[in-house]
Design a protein with these regions (language model features):
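Non-catalytic accessory segments flanking P-loop/AAA+ NTPase cores
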Residues: 1-240
Length: 240
């Protein structure tokens, strides 16, 4: 028979969990505030793990260096120089972010490049296959699951999750032509994604607990094959 846990033991466990969570926030903040990698240094690190894709690695390196140096400098100013709490600092950091669109064939290393970059920065990384998503209220995953996956990748820490990276795979598959029926896996998903990608305050419902999570500082990398992209461009140019 399992022995019941004493109130003192429960208290010690709660204190330890709080300590671990605070340490996790502190480490993530330290890495972002001290982040000083240049795009050249980031790409050199990626070269050790990702073969080829020179143009893609350069674009991702520039975007990530800009994003986290911007965020790090803003948090340093708010927290270190002005003495603001993390919640206030994240809300007050309003400089615009630039998300990334990566185009390339399946298996060329788009997702892995983003994962390598997230490890170098020291932030959580979540991958989402958009072909499995549908509009809220229908069978399948919906965009709120993206926030939950990011929260899980951050060890349940909402503050750390707000500074993470999300890779949106197969983004080209949710493109839709004009249709007369309700498109729950195309246009419906697009509308939900737009809110997240632009940066918004969101609520994750965990049953007995509700967690607020902003995507204002989450870096989104959208990847797709876009097989007929060249043909689409040619047809549009021909019309013009």
């Amino acid at each position: 028979m399992m022995e019941r846990m004493s109130p003192e033991t429960r208290r010690q466990i709660r204190e330890k969990l709080v300590e671990l969570r605070e340490n996790q926030i502190g480490e993530a903040l330290r890495q972002i505030i001290e982040f000083d990698k240049t795009p050249v240094a980031l790409k050199a690190h990626m070269d050790r793990f990702v073969i080829g894709q020179e143009k893609g690695k350069k674009i991702i390196s520039v975007a990530i260096a800009y994003h986290y140096r911007r965020l790090g400098n803003a948090l340093k100013h708010s927290m270190v120089e002005n003495g603001e709490e993390l919640d206030v600092a994240l809300r007050n950091t309003t400089t615009p972010k630039a998300n990334i669109l990566v185009v390339g064939p399946t298996g060329c290393g788009k997702t892995y490049t983003g994962e390598v970059a997230s490890r170098l920065v020291g932030v959580p990384f979540a991958v989402e296959d958009l072909t499995k998503f549908s509009e809220v209220g229908y069978v399948g995953q919906n965009v709120s699951d993206i926030l939950l996956d990011l929260l899980i990748a951050a060890g349940g820490n909402a503050h750390v999750a707000q500074m993470g990276i999300v890779y949106l795979d197969e983004v080209d598959k949710i493109a839709t032509e004009s249709v007369v029926y309700k498109d729950v896996s195309g246009r419906g998903v697009q509308k939900g994604l737009l809110k997240l990608v632009e940066g918004a305050e969101n609520t994750i419902d965990l049953g007995k607990e509700r967690i607020s999570l902003s995507t204002r500082h989450v870096l989104f990398i959208a990847g797709g094959v876009y097989e007929d992209l060249e043909g689409i461009v040619k047809r549009r140019m021909a019309r013009d």
